[in-house]
């Protein structure tokens, strides 16, 4: 038998069911692929509109967001805000993040000291800031991480601080309680289930069967323009000056 062609062909009067099925897929496969391409473009278009209206709602635009992982920089990017914080494209372990939030100014007086991580699977830069570890997961080199850190550290607005935490990365209930008790004007923690006893907890739906929230910056589904962290009204939160 002849090989299946890679482009659409029209076969007149196919003489078997097998031939009819083959012709059908040859005719419509490109359309199926195109559908995915169109879907991505439509999602991008509608997400851009969603972000546009959020930017109109936003009144407080000189925010410094101290975040424990990449949710922070993704939210800032959606809102078109400058990264006025060095906590971008990195993550911090829960207990370390709580120490950092409690004594932010003190920790920021120290220089980064890059170390070789004990975990062999970690191939990105890791640094100590005094006694806490910073995992620069989305940086290719220590130099790149250091330059970005120092540049953004100089933009911090200590009069407009917001602290964003999640229940990921081994976070315990005690970590959540400790974070909730910090004397911070603006703090929130994204959680996989409701915590009525934790005032700063924000319930993110969709992770109830998990032990923590997943990647909150991802879209909820193939067809949705909403990301998981959109359950949190971060615009209203930032506007609470």
Q: What residue spans do the PLM features occupy?
A:
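Short, hydrophobic beta-strand segments that form beta-sheet elements in well-ordered domains
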Residues: 164, 185-192
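A short secondary-structure junction signal
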Residues: 172-178
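Polybasic, proline/glycine-rich intrinsically disordered low-complexity segments
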Residues: 192-240
């Amino acid at each position: 038998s002849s090989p299946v062609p890679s482009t659409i062909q029209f076969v007149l009067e196919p003489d078997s069911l097998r031939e009819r099925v083959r012709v059908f897929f040859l005719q419509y496969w490109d359309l199926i692929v195109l559908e995915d391409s169109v879907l991505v473009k439509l999602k991008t278009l509608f997400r851009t509109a969603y972000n546009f209206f959020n930017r109109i709602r936003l009144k407080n635009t000189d925010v410094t967001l101290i975040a424990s992982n990449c949710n922070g920089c993704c939210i800032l990017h959606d809102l078109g805000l400058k990264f006025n914080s060095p906590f971008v494209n990195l993550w911090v372990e829960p207990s370390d993040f709580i120490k950092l939030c409690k004594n932010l100014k003190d920790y920021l007086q120290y220089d980064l000291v890059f170390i070789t991580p004990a975990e062999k699977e970690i191939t990105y830069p890791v640094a100590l800031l005094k006694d806490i570890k910073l995992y620069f997961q989305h940086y290719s080199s220590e130099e790149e991480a250091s330059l970005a850190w120092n540049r953004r550290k100089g933009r911090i607005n200590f009069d407009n601080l917001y602290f964003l935490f999640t229940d990921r990365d081994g976070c315990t209930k005690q970590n959540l309680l400790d974070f909730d008790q910090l004397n911070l004007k603006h703090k929130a923690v994204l959680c996989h289930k409701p915590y009525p006893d934790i005032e700063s907890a924000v319930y993110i739906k969709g992770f109830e069967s998990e032990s923590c929230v997943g990647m909150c910056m991802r879209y909820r589904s193939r067809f949705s323009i909403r990301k998981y962290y959109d359950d949190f009204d971060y615009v209203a939160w930032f506007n609470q000056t």
